[in-house]
């Protein structure tokens, strides 16, 4: 499998106003963007809309999405879907004209004390689901710890497990996307970077989530973007309030969504933007919004995208 390099950065140049036009006035700086018009494929967590994949697909299509991120179908988590269910899900999505951007697995969303093989077995199951749905991306996490244990206490155990998961992924031709979930080892920019640098695998990249960083007291763009951008391959769209941690529509919280989106565009990002609103409820395996709230979240993000001259398709 070819090594995946970081998306190249694109700079801007500053042009002075022509001498004849200045008339003794101060030089006017004009920012000339060298970034081509951005087009981002739009996706979303279907089960935030409804348990029924047909309803999920209909709503996403109505909101202009071309893809869906699959976490569960008919109320069954992807880690427990039978082959027949995966085949039926693929049929439904094909009929609707939706492709799958990623499988949002629960791998790594367990205590680090469980044996390495526990999550490897679950990842093997998820890989079969990803193949059935024709996507290379699988969302994962970097393990919880028991009360009283520090992040440093579990670091080595986490890195062993993340390395084993990445090795299986690379062997299988898929790419793992680490989400910076609150409470896991990799919930701060510094520890996410530690995972990326320590594992050093082309099959382990970042699913960036602004809201999750806010919930652990981090200013996402200010404190984490430059550090993690070389590994950022997938954008999960969520915002949150710093005071309460409440998830809110894009641009209404403290997640620095506007700055992040502008920077991604300037850097030439062309990957998925996946809506994960969590506007009605959140729980251990995900969250729920319902069709109306999901639409609110989609429109809020679309407004920020339009402001930054990004076309969502």
What do these predicted regions represent?
Residues 70-93, 143-149:
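Glycine-rich, proline-tolerant flexible connector loops at the mouths of alpha/beta enzymes
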Residues 69, 102-104, 139, 177, ...:
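Conserved beta-strand positions in the central sheet of alpha/beta enzyme cores
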Residues 5, 23-24:
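Residue-identity detector for glycine
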Residues 11, 28-66, 94, 134, ...:
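Histidine-acidic metal/acid-base catalytic patches
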Residues 48-50, 72-74, 106-109, 142-146, ...:
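Active-site-proximal loop/turn and secondary-structure-junction residues that shape catalytic pockets
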Residues 11, 34, 52-58, 91-95, ...:
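Active-site acidic/histidine proton-transfer and metal-coordination neighborhood
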Residues 19, 26-29:
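Charged/polar low-complexity intrinsically disordered segments
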């Amino acid at each position: 499998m070819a090594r995946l390099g970081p998306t190249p950065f694109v700079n801007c140049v500053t042009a002075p106003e022509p001498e004849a036009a200045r008339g003794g006035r101060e030089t006017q700086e004009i920012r000339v963007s060298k970034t081509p018009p951005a087009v981002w494929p739009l996706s979303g967590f279907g089960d935030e809309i409804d348990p029924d994949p047909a309803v999920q697909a209909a709503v996403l299509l109505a909101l202009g999405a071309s893809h869906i991120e699959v976490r569960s179908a008919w109320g069954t988590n992807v880690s427990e879907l039978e082959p027949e269910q995966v085949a039926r899900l693929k049929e439904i999505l094909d009929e609707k004209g939706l492709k799958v951007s990623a499988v949002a697995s629960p791998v790594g969303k367990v205590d680090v004390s469980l044996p390495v093989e526990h999550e490897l077995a679950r990842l093997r199951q998820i890989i079969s689901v990803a193949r059935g749905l024709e996507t290379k991306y699988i969302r994962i996490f970097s393990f919880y710890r028991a009360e009283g244990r520090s992040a440093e206490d579990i670091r080595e155990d986490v890195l062993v497990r993340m390395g084993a998961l990445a090795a299986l992924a690379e062997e299988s031709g898929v790419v793992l996307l680490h989400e910076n979930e609150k409470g896991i080892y990799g919930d701060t920019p510094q520890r996410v970077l530690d995972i990326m640098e320590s594992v050093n695998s082309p099959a382990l990249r970042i699913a960036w989530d602004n809201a999750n960083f806010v919930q652990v007291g981090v200013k996402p763009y200010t404190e984490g973007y430059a550090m993690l951008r070389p590994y950022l391959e997938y954008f999960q769209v969520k915002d949150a309030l710093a005071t309460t941690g409440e998830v809110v529509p894009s641009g209404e919280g403290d997640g620095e969504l506007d700055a992040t989106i502008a920077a991604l565009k300037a850097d030439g990002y062309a990957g998925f933007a996946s809506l994960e609103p969590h506007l009605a409820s959140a729980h251990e395996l995900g969250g729920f919004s319902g069709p109306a709230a999901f639409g609110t979240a989609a429109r809020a993000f679309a407004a920020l995208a339009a402001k930054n001259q990004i076309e969502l398709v």
